[in-house]
Each structure stands twice: as C-alpha cells, then as structure tokens.
C-alpha cells in the first residue's frame, strides 16, 4: 500500500527541502496566530520559491478563519486548505467555507470529543477529512494520539471520502498506526521536531523508514 504523507508545521526552507526529499507528498504551513508554528504568507512565499514542489502540494492550515483570511489563503494559491474547528461550530459557516474554497480543495478537521461520533451533516461539504487528537483548549500540534478506532470506522463507513490520520504520529508509532487504522494518508508534525517549528531530520528519516 502506498501511503501519502503530509509534513506539517513547516517554518524553514531547509526542513521543507528535507521533508520532500524524504518522501513527503504534501507540506503544511500553519497560519493560525496562536500556534507556535505560525508562519506568514510572505514567509511561505520566500520558502516556496526555490522548492521543488507544485502549489497543489502545499497545504494552508487555519483555525476557524474569517472569510477575509480564507480569501487570502485562496489567493495565495494553496492546493488544499485545512480548516480546524470546534465540534459545535455553526454549520452555516462551514457551508460558506465550502462555497468559497470548493469541496475538492477543502480539508475539514473537526475537533471531536472522544465520546461523540462523526458529524454526518458536514460530509457533503468537503472531499477530505482530517482526524486529529482532541484537547479542550488546543487545535492540533499537541503530540497526543487521536481516535484511531473512530478513524478506522469512519474511513470504512464513508469510503467515498479521503481520510487523513493526524495526532501524535511519530517514528515510534507510525507502523502500528497504519496497521491499526488502515490509513492511506497521514499527517505528522510534532513527532518529527526538535522544537515547535524546527524539524528533526533524523526523526523524519526514521519516520519514513518505519512506514509499513
């Protein structure tokens, strides 16, 4: 099985280059200001100018953005736009995101409390869904493990959609994660870092080596 990998939280060109050379199919850039891996659009532009990557393989990441911020991401030219939001976030705003971005480019990442199921009402709004770890006060990048059992069920039940497994993935658990969830696409961030926003190249190498 071929596994697609997105390395997220890129803030430096040297890390972007190494991730691509190691086998990453996507790079993620976090525009959320409260993230320790926050990066500005002009900084992403400077990094991407000399990268061997098509814009379609660059992913912009935000949390509950307003339409103006979302439009800036679209205008930048990201191939995909990954949006995190609370479980009870208004569906009418999600529909507006879908209309503005388009379901093909939109990756929806609901923050799902473990006792709740997947909200079926959002399925028509995007073609891709990312399952990250749940914490009450943060959106992604926590190093915590996500709901693997839920991911496995939802990927099988809603198999016309693309599902991305995120949350606490590392060289130490990527083999178990893929074998347990049957994930075809994974997102790694803090598990291959020295510090927030600074990647550990040895861990990146080990991560790709350990993919089953």
Question: Language model features by range: what are they?
Answer:
Residues 1-185, 190-212:
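Conserved N-terminal beta1-alpha1 strand-loop-helix module at the mouth
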């Amino acid at each position: 099985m071929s596994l697609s990998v997105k390395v997220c939280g890129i803030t430096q060109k040297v890390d972007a280059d190494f991730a691509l050379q190691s086998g990453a199919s996507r790079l993620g850039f976090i525009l959320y200001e409260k993230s320790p891996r926050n990066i500005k659009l002009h900084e992403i532009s400077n990094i991407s100018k000399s990268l061997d990557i098509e814009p379609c393989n660059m992913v912009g990441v935000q949390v509950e953005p307003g339409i103006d911020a979302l439009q800036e991401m679209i205008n930048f030219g990201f191939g995909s736009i990954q949006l995190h939001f609370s479980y009870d976030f208004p569906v009418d705003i999600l529909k507006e995101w879908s209309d503005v971005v388009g379901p093909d480019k939109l990756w929806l990442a609901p923050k799902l409390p473990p006792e709740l199921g997947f909200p079926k009402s959002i399925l028509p709004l995007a073609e891709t869904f990312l399952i990250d770890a749940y914490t009450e006060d943060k959106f992604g990048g926590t190093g915590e493990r996500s709901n693997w059992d839920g991911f496995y069920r939802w990927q099988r039940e809603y198999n016309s959609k693309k599902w991305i497994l995120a949350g606490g993935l590392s060289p130490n658990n990527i083999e178990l994660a893929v074998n347990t969830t049957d994930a075809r696409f994974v997102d790694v961030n803090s598990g291959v870092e020295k510090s927030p926003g600074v990647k550990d190249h040895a861990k990146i190498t080990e991560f790709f080596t350990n993919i089953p």
